[in-house]
Swiss-Prot record:
Keywords noted in UniProt: Ribonucleoprotein, Ribosomal protein
Stretches for region Disordered: 1-21
Domain of life: Archaea
GO CC annotations on file: cytosolic small ribosomal subunit
BP GO annotations: translation
Pfam families assigned to the protein according to its UniProt record, in alphabetical order: Ribosomal_S13_N, Ribosomal_S15
Species name: Pyrococcus horikoshii (strain ATCC 700860 / DSM 12428 / JCM 9974 / NBRC 100139 / OT-3)
Designated name of the protein: Small ribosomal subunit protein uS15
Keyword Ribonucleoprotein attributed: yes
């Protein structure tokens, strides 16, 4: 598959083994996993970090192998668990990380205004932000009147 802003192919990576059910040796129930996710979120970990901790420390390969107890036709995800318990971030995490990158790059460009490579990088990051904002508005994760503003983004990112 090609990269978004380059005309070349991406690097190949390792693939997860195809599984449809949790491994037999896994002793955790859905309730145990929900409690672990909520506990880790309250400790301040991001969803990506929670998944890594569950994999490395608890031996849970992926949460998606389990079924959502509220809707058995849906896979369980860390984000759904956090939404259910009211711990989901108001701005989706991938969007927040891109906004944080854009803010840091703007700060760099204030000190180095002639850095044209970074200027181009900022344009690409902000294009990704606008594309994600459009998607999240359509899905209802962001309000319809939400806009990306670089000055307001500084306040969003601590």
């Amino acid at each position: 598959m090609a990269r978004m802003h380059a005309r070349k192919r991406g690097k190949s990576g390792s693939k997860r083994p195809p599984r449809t059910a949790p491994p037999i040796w896994l002793d955790y129930t859905v309730e145990d996993i929900e409690n672990l996710v909520v506990k880790l979120r309250k400790e301040g970990y991001s969803t990506a970090m929670i998944g890594t901790i569950l994999r490395d420390q608890y031996g849970i390969p992926t949460v998606k192998l389990f079924r959502d107890p509220d809707n058995p036709n849906r896979k369980l995800t860390i984000t759904r668990i956090l939404e259910k318990h009211g711990l989901a971030p108001e701005i989706p995490e991938d969007l927040m990380f891109l906004i944080r990158r854009a803010v840091n790059l703007r700060k760099h460009l204030e000190q180095h205004p002639k850095d044209l490579h970074s200027m181009r990088g900022l344009q690409l990051i902000e294009s990704k932000i606008r594309r994600l904002v459009k998607y999240y508005k359509r899905k209802g994760k962001l309000p319809r009147d939400w806009r990306y503003d670089p000055e307001q983004a500084k306040l969003l990112v601590r």
